[in-house]
Amino acid sequence: VIVDEMQDYSWIQFVLLKKLFPCRMTILGDKAQTMEEKQQDALTFLPGIFGRDIRKIIMNRSYRNTMEIAQYANRLTGIQDIELFDRHGAAVEERHFENLEAALDMVIEKWEQKRADYETEALILFTEAEAEHAFLYLEDRLKSRDPDGEYELTYMNRDSQNFKKGLTVTTFYLAKGLE
């Protein structure tokens, strides 16, 4: 049995997995990618479930991001023991807005500047309510700029079955793994 994204499983879920599948398991994950607000390190409770004879292999080379993004994320998470892949990109921009609508206006501006360069982009929000509000706001603003509807805006929720080109608005938990 292979279990991926171990950081998103709770103690009880691992107990159930062991009970349902009494065999050897390969459990993979990255505690820095948890979907919970607080990081939980499953390695603290896995020995209590599966016994002390656990072989732990730590892979600390990051290949997904540019050095600039990885260093910025590491400052936020406090994780410093990651070997970064030597790939560079633009510096991370941190912007602060008075409200969500001001941030969404900037999203429209940036998207319109770059949309010829990318087939798909995503605006990822924390909650479904925020994502739906953002989608409706963007839809209204984009319709007023382009009444013919050539703006390719999609709202992705739990019921979505298709992934379309353009700008997709969704939540972080639905976007996980789509990168």
Tell me the role of every PLM-derived stretch.
Residues 7-179:
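Conserved helicase motor core of SF1/SF2 NTP-dependent helicases
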